[in-house]
Regions:
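Pre-P-loop entry segment of helicase/translocase ATPase cores
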Residues: 238-277
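Conserved small/polar residues in nucleotide/adenosyl-binding loops
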Residues: 278-284
Length: 288
């Protein structure tokens, strides 16, 4: 087995570097070209084929270089933000910004996004707004913020405080979106925590108490639960400002990744020493 000791072009040096080291190794590539330490020729000729990661050490010109297929994949939204920040003080990163801008995934529109109650990325303020607008609690509750939605990222649990504050005579809470056994706020809390609402009775048997499922009340409560889900599905996109905010947030969180793409086309390099390296391949993103 022969070892390549020299090449004629940066493109050939890149092919050997990837084949031998699995990465863009500028010192090794410069050695192959017979000009140790001369990285400028390589980076200039391979502009757009390799990219320097802005997070790499700026004092090490040979560090942090990646092939285009590697750099322009993964979380390209985060990478674009980093490149834009770097380009403000280092104009050489403008090429990164241009390439990453073209690599951004197409934004999903509201009609392509399904947001359900219980999604942990939802801002509790949005759920609070839905709850107030839909259940329409008495003025004293709204004015004093007596019933509040909270989410704990530590326990991944949603909580609605003071669920009984609306009272048993509040029609929206106990009839329209809830029952007398489980009011709307209790059902909403179950829904946020992805639980089916269940109603239990406590009975005494042989001197001991035990809980048994009340099927009739449970069925009624689950009908109200479905009504709340359906109402939210229609409500969430109604307000244009809220819609734009949620679409942007969803795309940032869940539509930021670009898969790494290999074309598979063969590039043949000739003139390298020894002859055994006359067939080397690179993705077309690395062709020059």
């Amino acid at each position: 087995e022969h070892t390549v000791t020299s090449v004629d072009t940066p493109s050939e040096a890149l092919a050997v570097s990837i084949g031998e080291h699995g990465r863009v190794d500028l010192p090794y590539m410069a050695e192959l070209l017979g000009s140790p330490g001369d990285y400028e020729r390589i980076t200039t000729e391979l502009q757009g084929v390799i990219f320097k990661d802005p997070s790499a050490d700026a004092d090490e010109p040979e560090a942090g270089w990646q092939t285009a297929d590697e750099y322009l994949s993964g979380n390209v939204r985060n990478k674009l933000r980093m490149a834009q920040l770097a380009a403000e003080s280092h104009p050489e990163f403008k090429i990164n910004v241009e390439a990453l801008t073209k690599a951004q995934p197409k934004d999903l529109e509201a009609s392509e996004i399904d947001i359900r109650l219980g999604a942990t990325w939802l801002n509790p303020a949005i759920v609070q707004q839905f709850m107030m607008e839909t259940f329409q609690p008495p003025y004293r509750i709204r004015y004093n913020n007596l019933i509040q939605v909270r989410y704990s990222p530590f326990t991944s649990e949603w909580r609605i405080g003071n669920k009984s504050a609306a009272g048993m005579y509040d029609i929206m809470s106990t009839e329209t979106y809830g029952t007398h056994r489980a009011n709307a706020y209790k059902i909403l809390e179950d829904t946020l925590n992805l639980r089916d609402c269940r109603i239990y009775d406590t009975i005494e048997e042989d001197g001991k108490e035990r809980r048994v499922l009340n099927q009739k009340e449970t069925m009624l409560a689950q009908q109200k639960q479905q009504a709340i889900k359906d109402t939210f599905a229609g409500w969430v996109w109604q307000d244009p400002q809220r819609r734009n905010l949620l679409v942007k947030q969803y795309n940032e969180l869940f539509n930021s990744t670009r898969p790494r793409e290999y074309d598979g086309s063969h590039i043949h390099f000739v003139g390298m020493n020894p002859v055994s390296y006359t067939h080397l391949t690179l993705p077309t993103t690395e062709r020059v």
